[in-house]
């Protein structure tokens, strides 16, 4: 009954029979699924295999005339039905470490956002702009946009933290936060006690179906361990379906995985390098990124320096999965989490937009190499340390970055601040305070409400006259695609190579 017979007949279709109980056909990278269960039809495994062959040759709406064994009726008609995904079946979760990033996530079409407050989250040092007093406003803004809000309480919790943890959970519940992301059983248990939905962090390192089944008593969504490959993820997904593993809300547990962003050298966490070197615990949200530095390796006995191919021997490249999003979906991933709460709003907007487009293309059946190439180029423009596939496709060893900091192909250079928006003509006025701008420049506008807005400067006006170059100290007006606010920040986007060349001069 558990034997799996699979045949890959072409590059666009995968046909699988789970003999003798169930049969699945997936076409066009998973956008279509046909299923027949033997228990519902009464056919033997042999007959089910004939159905399997017939399905291969069939199209939606067609009927198969079957002639099973003599012990069964002479024939049966089975209509082929197809199941297609909708955008609501998936969730793009955006990282939010500032009000600018929150606005950028909402404008980019994120389905959910995650953020931290106070000291009990894994970005307490690098992205701690929110406090407990902000919870109600964040929940309200997200609700108005139809976006779910998730609060991270995912550090190691000590006895002295229990009172603060409960205070934060109570405040989240009262504010209407959608869920708490937790890694400690104390947090999970208290969330369940007060009726606050909880999701499980990758810090738990859940890597098998039995562990997921155990934790399902607490949570409806589980982030699996980052070191799993997609075959392992699929086995866990199949177990959820077959065993009907449900969370406290009564729904099948959903699988969440990181799809983009920085990877820790310790994979799913529990790193003590920063604590050992600088007394700053990564597991308490205070990682000092010691692993990102360049190192030389010496033999302690002889003091001979060993030759290594890369000085950044503990700094992984960033994860990027957009080119195999179809495989992620086929493995059962339903919530796609983007790392980057310490990143700027332009990063959040660009990454969310690309992955949202990728999922929509998968659903539409228009996912293509050309689109992937376009997304890749756009993703390269924002913060990254170079990209690799992570461990999802079976790679056993990591890939290491070649530089300290970002390898983004574009860098932002501060130019000025917003003064006024003329809504009747869609024009914004800015005061140029630093770097000059010129016609043809790619500009970035950021702000707590504006988020991140890109615009190409096609025409610039100074005192109503068109100009090609706008110098420091000058008020300039130009068309923008949306409203800007006073004190929004204006940047000029510069190719990274151009900026490096100027610094060498």
Which residues make up each language-model segment?
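Conserved non-cysteine loop/helix-boundary elements of the Radical SAM core domain that shape
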Residues: 125-129
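Glycine/small-residue-rich interface belts in oligomeric ring/scaffold proteins
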Residues: 130-134
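Intrinsically disordered, low-complexity segments enriched in small polar residues
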Residues: 2, 6-13, 29-47, 58-62
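Short hydrophobic targeting helices and cationic amphipathic motifs
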Residues: 22-23, 44, 50, 57, ...
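Surface-exposed amphipathic alpha-helical tracts and adjacent flexible/coil segments at the periphery
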Residues: 83-108, 112-124, 136-139, 143-155, ...
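Short, glycine/polar-rich helix-capping loops at beta-to-alpha or helix-loop-helix junctions
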Residues: 207-212
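Well-ordered mid-protein domain cores that form the structural environment of catalytic cofactors
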Residues: 165-201
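Residue-level detector of intrinsically disordered terminal segments
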Residues: 16, 47, 55, 77-82
């Amino acid at each position: 009954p558990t034997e799996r017979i699979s045949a890959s007949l072409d590059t666009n279709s995968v046909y699988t029979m789970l003999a003798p109980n169930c049969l699945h056909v997936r076409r066009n990278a998973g956008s279509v699924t046909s299923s027949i269960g033997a228990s519902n039809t009464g056919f033997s495994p042999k007959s089910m295999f004939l159905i399997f062959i017939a399905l291969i040759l069939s199209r939606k709406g067609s009927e198969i005339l079957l002639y099973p064994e003599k012990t069964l009726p002479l024939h049966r008609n089975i209509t082929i039905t197809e199941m297609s995904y909708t955008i609501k079946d998936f969730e793009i979760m955006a990282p939010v470490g500032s009000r600018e990033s929150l606005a950028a996530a909402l404008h980019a079409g994120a389905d959910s956002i995650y953020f931290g407050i106070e000291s009990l989250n894994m970005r307490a040092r690098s992205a701690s702009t929110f406090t407990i007093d902000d919870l109600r406003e964040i929940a309200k803004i997200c609700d108005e946009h139809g976006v779910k809000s998730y609060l991270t309480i995912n550090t190691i919790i000590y006895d002295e933290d229990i009172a603060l943890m409960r205070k934060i959970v109570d405040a989240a519940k009262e504010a209407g936060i959608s869920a708490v992301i937790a890694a400690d059983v104390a947090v999970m248990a208290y969330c369940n006690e007060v009726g606050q939905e909880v999701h499980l962090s990758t810090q738990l390192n859940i890597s098998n179906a039995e562990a997921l089944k155990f934790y399902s008593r607490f949570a409806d969504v589980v982030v699996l361990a980052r070191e799993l490959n997609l075959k392992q993820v699929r086995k866990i997904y199949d177990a959820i379906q077959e065993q009907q593993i449900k969370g406290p809300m009564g729904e099948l547990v959903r699988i969440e995985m990181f799809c983009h962003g920085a990877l820790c050298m310790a994979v799913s966490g529990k790193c003590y390098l920063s604590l050992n070197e600088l007394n700053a615990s990564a597991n308490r949200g205070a990682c000092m990124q010691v692993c990102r530095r360049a190192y030389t390796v010496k033999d302690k006995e002889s003091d001979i320096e060993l030759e290594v191919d890369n000085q950044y021997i503990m700094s992984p490249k960033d994860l990027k999965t957009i080119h195999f999003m179809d495989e992620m979906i086929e493995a059962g991933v339903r919530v796609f989490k983007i790392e980057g709460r310490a990143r700027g709003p332009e990063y959040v907007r660009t990454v969310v937009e690309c992955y949202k487009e990728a999922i929509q293309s998968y659903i539409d059946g228009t996912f293509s190499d050309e689109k992937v190439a376009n997304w890749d180029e756009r993703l390269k423009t924002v913060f990254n340390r170079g990209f690799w596939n992570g461990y999802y496709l079976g790679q056993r060893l990591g890939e290491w970055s070649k530089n300290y900091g970002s390898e983004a192909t574009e860098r932002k250079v501060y130019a000025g601040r917003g003064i006024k928006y003329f809504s009747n003509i869609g024009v914004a006025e800015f005061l140029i305070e630093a770097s000059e701008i010129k016609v043809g420049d790619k500009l970035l506008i950021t702000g707590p409400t504006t988020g991140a807005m890109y615009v190409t400067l096609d025409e610039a006006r100074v005192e109503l006259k068109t100009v090609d170059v706008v110098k420091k100290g000058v008020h300039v007006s130009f068309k923008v695609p949306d409203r800007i606010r006073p004190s929004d920040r204006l940047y000029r986007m510069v190719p990274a190579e151009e900026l490096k060349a100027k610094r060498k001069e």
